[in-house]
Structure formats: structure tokens, C-alpha cells
């Protein structure tokens, strides 16, 4: 259908901010993006801690879509980060200054109508917001934190049977005066069927660069970076 609604204990990273070709990598920075997870309260509703939420999606065509969602602001139900309080995902608590998390995304997913011959792509822009109070780097508090992001996945080379080379790039930001990372970039390449006779194996090379907010670089290094090379073997 054109309209889709979800309500319940949800994982935001399953539907917002993900990448088609970044899923092969093990480092968590290639999953839920660090420009959101590191700059919100207790990482937000993402694997493996869901949150009570509501998501609406409108499919304008087979490829164009828009979606928005709102979630409980603290998946741990603990401002101090005690993960044991909601370790089973059944502790529901709203209020107490937790605020709420919201995400918004608009995009075109060419993989939805891939004809098996062309080079499809998936392009989207989005925003995230958390409403609670955050400590700023100057010692004061600020209401809320938010950021913007853009993501592109593109198949670059196709072989028969779904094999081929694809790439992704993802860039996101957050408010500089109250965030750990001011902006984060991750990108990579993924090749399915690189080796002869191994049509379902996937090889990948990925890179993440996370720029610390300028106000905290006196205490820590200016950035963090990840380089990962991986090879996933299909056994059966």
C-alpha cells in the first residue's frame, strides 16, 4: 500500500539512516550512524534496544517515499546510562525529562524496482531531533539537539545473478556546542561475487571519519577514524 504505519517497541535504525552496501561491515559505526548515536541520549532506539514509538511512511511511487517517526527519548530509561533497567526491552517509562526522539527522511530507492539490468541507486536526505536538555561544552545547558544527513548508495558494476560492485557514502551533522561529533562521514565499497565460483560471498572496504566538536578538541584528539576490510563467506 501507499501508506504504512507502525506502532510498538521499534528500532529506528532499521528504517532511518541505513545503507544498502554498508551492512556487510562489523564496526558499529557502519550501522547506526555516529552523528546520531553519539550525540543523543543513550544512543537512541537502535539494535539491540528498541523504544516505544510510532512511524508513518508514505510511498508516492514504487521508488519515491517520505517517512517520519517519534520514539521514547531514552531507551535505557536511565539518564545515567544503566542498561540493566531495560535489559529485556519491556520497561516502559515516559516523562522524567527523557524527552522524545524524532526522525524524518525523504528519498528515492531505485532498488525497489530493479529490473536486473541497470545500475540502481538509493538516495535520501533526513533529519533527527532529540527534545531533552543537553549539557553544552561551555558548562551551560541547551534545549534539544538535532542534525541533518544525506546518504547515497549506488551500484557501479553489475554481473549476472545479482553480483557486482556497489558503493555508499553517508554524511551527517549535529549541533557543535553540545555534541561529541560535529560531523561524521562514512563511505565504502562492496563487491558480491568477487572471486570465481563464490557468487554469494561479499568483499568490502569501508572508512569512517568522525570530527569531534571544536570545543572539546583541547581534551581529546580532533577526530576518530575507522578503516575496515571484510570478507563474508556464504557457507550454504
Language model segments and positions:
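Residues on the lipid-exposed face of transmembrane beta-strands in outer-membrane beta-barrel proteins
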Residues: 1, 7, 54-58, 104-108, ...
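Short loop/turn motifs that connect adjacent beta-strands in outer-membrane beta-barrel proteins
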Residues: 2, 17, 63, 111-122, ...
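Surface-exposed coil loops of outer-membrane beta-barrel proteins
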Residues: 2-102
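Transmembrane beta-barrel strands of outer-membrane/channel proteins
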Residues: 5-9, 66-72, 123-129, 165-173, ...
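Extracellular loop and loop/strand-boundary signature of outer-membrane beta-barrel proteins
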Residues: 39-42, 85-94, 137-139, 172-176, ...
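Residues that define the transmembrane beta-barrel architecture of outer-membrane proteins
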Residues: 48-52, 98-102, 144-148, 181-185, ...
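Surface-exposed beta-loop-beta
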Residues: 73-153, 159
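C-terminal hydrophobic structural anchor segments
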Residues: 179-236
Amino acid at each position: 500500500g501507499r501508506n504504512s504505519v507502525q506502532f510498538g517497541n521499534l528500532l529506528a535504525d532499521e528504517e532511518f539512516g541505513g545503507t544498502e552496501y554498508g551492512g556487510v561491515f562489523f564496526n558499529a559505526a557502519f550501522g547506526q550512524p555516529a552523528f546520531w548515536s553519539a550525540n543523543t541520549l543513550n544512543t537512541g532506539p537502535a539494535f539491540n534496544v528498541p523504544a516505544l514509538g510510532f512511524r508513518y511512511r508514505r510511498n508516492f511511487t514504487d521508488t519515491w517515499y517520505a517517512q517520519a517517526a517519534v520514539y521514547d527519548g531514552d531507551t535505557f530509561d536511565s539518564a545515567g546510562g544503566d542498561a540493566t533497567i531495560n535489559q529485556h526491552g519491556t520497561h516502559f517509562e515516559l516523562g522524567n525529562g527523557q524527552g522524545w526522539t524524532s526522525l524524518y527522511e525523504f528519498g528515492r530507492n531505485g532498488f525497489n524496482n530493479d529490473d536486473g539490468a541497470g545500475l540502481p541507486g538509493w538516495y535520501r536526505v533526513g533529519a533527527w531531533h532529540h527534545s531533552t536538555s543537553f549539557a553544552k561544552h561551555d558548562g551551560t545547558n541547551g534545549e534539544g539537539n538535532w542534525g541533518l544527513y544525506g546518504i547515497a548508495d549506488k551500484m557501479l558494476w553489475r554481473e549476472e545473478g545479482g553480483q557486482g560492485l556497489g558503493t555508499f557514502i553517508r554524511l551527517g551533522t549535529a549541533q557543535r556546542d553540545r555534541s561529541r561529533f560535529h560531523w561524521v562521514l562514512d563511505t565504502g565499497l562492496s563487491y558480491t561475487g568477487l572471486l570465481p565460483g563464490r557468487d554469494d560471498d561479499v568483499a568490502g572496504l569501508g572508512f569512517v571519519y568522525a570530527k569531534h566538536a571544536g570545543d572539546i578538541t583541547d581534551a581529546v584528539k580532533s577526530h576518530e577514524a575507522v578503516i575496515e576490510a571484510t570478507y563474508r563467506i556464504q557457507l550454504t
